[in-house]
């Protein structure tokens, strides 16, 4: 299933239903770049290895996300529903949001060689706002609707204008006490910002007075003497301004909500605390938190705690095929990259009288998927395809081996030649 900017909202409910009902969710990402340190060795700590990934996720971003929903069925088969999502870094001009987009030349070259369509990713991808970006935008809108904004206008206003307004009000009050002047004071103003500034001055320094904005001036009256008749026109004018202001605020908040975009799906996965499957997925997880949360924990301990609190469990198929005794007949003598492992388990079944350790059940017989034929023709390094292949590896493990050590390798992730056991690290 291909998800893009135009069909994301209409397919979101369907995706959420899959999140609800799937037993596992496999995830894969394509990055705009990845920092590497070829000097990493056994002397480097897990924190050193994590710090490299953290810096990488801050500098670079995710171009594409693949998600496959895995259903385990009672008939010994499974259903895998793959989704491919291009992620657009572009934001609407109305949001006034500055966002950097960095890429690594070698990563871009590699993806082009694999047939990656960058024009499609940028123009048709699903937009998003990180949690921090959304919060900052909402705060800006709220600031405009509070007295804090008026205070900032007051501070920025020409001091002489405020001094003159203050003196006019004081003189009027003195004259009004001797009953020798009008029951109201009109203060001429050149624009609405100055009117707001003087309104704030009246509210702060003269609490017994009320001010009413007119087109070219501000009218000041005693609050206790403002009858309904006297102020009806002014009240209507104020009401219209308030309604217009509230509508503007509401429109801005709605605009922000609409542009949360792809993070709605991420939030739903976190809400349901799903079991996640990945392949060499430490980088995927770090980048996902960076993209959607807007920040990544500084320490590997904090990151481990974040993962355990966000997901029910995490399984890494690279680690499983490296370490599980139940899978050594697959991984023995071949690389543990995704393509090599999937090619191995996709081999035709051996005869039942053969001495080979390879399973005598074909991989195809394990999978029921309307996209199976299409996925078999796709090129690797499309995120949707890679998440689907990751799902195949996991399905093979749980349905065609004893998977006796599944608890042992739960929440353990490979990281730059080492392993991070989230359970032990947080204990």
UniProtKB/Swiss-Prot annotation:
One of its GO terms (biological process) is regulatory ncRNA-mediated heterochromatin formation. This is Uncharacterized protein C29A10.09c. PANTHER family: POLY A -SPECIFIC RIBONUCLEASE/TARGET OF EGR1, MEMBER 1 (PTHR15092), POLY(A)-SPECIFIC RIBONUCLEASE PNLDC1 (PTHR15092:SF22). SUPFAM superfamilies: Ribonuclease H-like. Coiled coil: none annotated. Belongs to the CAF1 family. Pfam families: CAF1. One of its GO terms (cellular component) is nucleus. It comes from Schizosaccharomyces pombe (strain 972 / ATCC 24843) (Fission yeast). It comes from the Eukaryota. One of its GO terms (molecular function) is 3'-5'-RNA exonuclease activity.
């Amino acid at each position: 299933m291909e998800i893009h900017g135009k069909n994301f909202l209409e397919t979101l409910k369907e995706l959420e239903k899959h999140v609800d009902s799937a037993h596992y969710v496999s995830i894969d990402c394509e990055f705009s770049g990845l920092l590497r340190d070829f000097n990493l060795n056994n002397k480097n700590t897990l924190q050193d290895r994590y710090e490299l990934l953290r810096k990488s996720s801050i500098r670079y971003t995710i171009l594409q996300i693949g998600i496959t929903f895995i259903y385990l069925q009672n008939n010994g088969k499974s259903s895998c529903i793959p989704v491919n999502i291009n992620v657009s870094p572009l934001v609407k001009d109305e949001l006034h949001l500055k966002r950097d987009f960095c890429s690594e030349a070698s990563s871009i070259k590699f993806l082009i060689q694999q047939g990656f369509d960058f024009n499609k990713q940028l123009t048709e991808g699903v937009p998003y706002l990180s949690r921090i970006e959304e919060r900052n935008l909402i705060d800006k809108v709220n600031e405009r609707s509070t007295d804090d904004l008026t205070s900032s206008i007051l501070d920025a206003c020409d001091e002489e204008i405020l001094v003159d307004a203050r003196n006019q009000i004081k003189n009027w009050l003195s004259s009004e006490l001797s009953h020798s002047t009008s029951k109201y004071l009109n203060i001429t103003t050149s624009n609405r910002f100055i009117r707001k500034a003087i309104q704030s001055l009246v509210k702060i320094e003269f609490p017994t007075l009320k001010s009413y904005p007119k087109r070219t001036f501000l009218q000041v009256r005693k609050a206790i003497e403002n009858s309904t008749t006297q102020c009806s026109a002014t009240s209507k004018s104020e009401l219209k301004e308030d309604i217009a202001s509230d509508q503007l605020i509401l429109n801005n908040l709605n605009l922000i909500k609409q542009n949360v975009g792809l993070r709605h799906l991420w939030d739903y996965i976190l809400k349901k605390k799903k079991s996640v499957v990945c392949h060499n997925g430490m980088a995927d997880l770090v980048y996902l938190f960076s993209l959607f949360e807007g920040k990544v924990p500084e320490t590997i301990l904090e990151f481990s705690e974040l993962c355990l609190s966000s997901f029910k469990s995490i399984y890494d198929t690279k680690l499983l095929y490296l370490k599980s005794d139940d899978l050594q007949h697959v991984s023995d003598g071949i690389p543990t990259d995704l393509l090599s492992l999937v090619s191995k388990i996709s081999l035709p079944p051996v005869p039942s009288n053969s001495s080979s350790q390879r399973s005598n059940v074909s991989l195809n017989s394990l999978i029921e998927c309307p996209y199976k034929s299409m996925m078999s023709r796709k090129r690797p390094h499309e995120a949707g395809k890679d998440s689907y292949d990751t799902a195949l590896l996991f399905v093979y493990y749980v349905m065609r081996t004893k998977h006796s050590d599944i608890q042992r390798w739960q929440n353990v992730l490979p990281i730059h030649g080492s392993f991070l056991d989230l359970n032990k690290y947080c204990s």
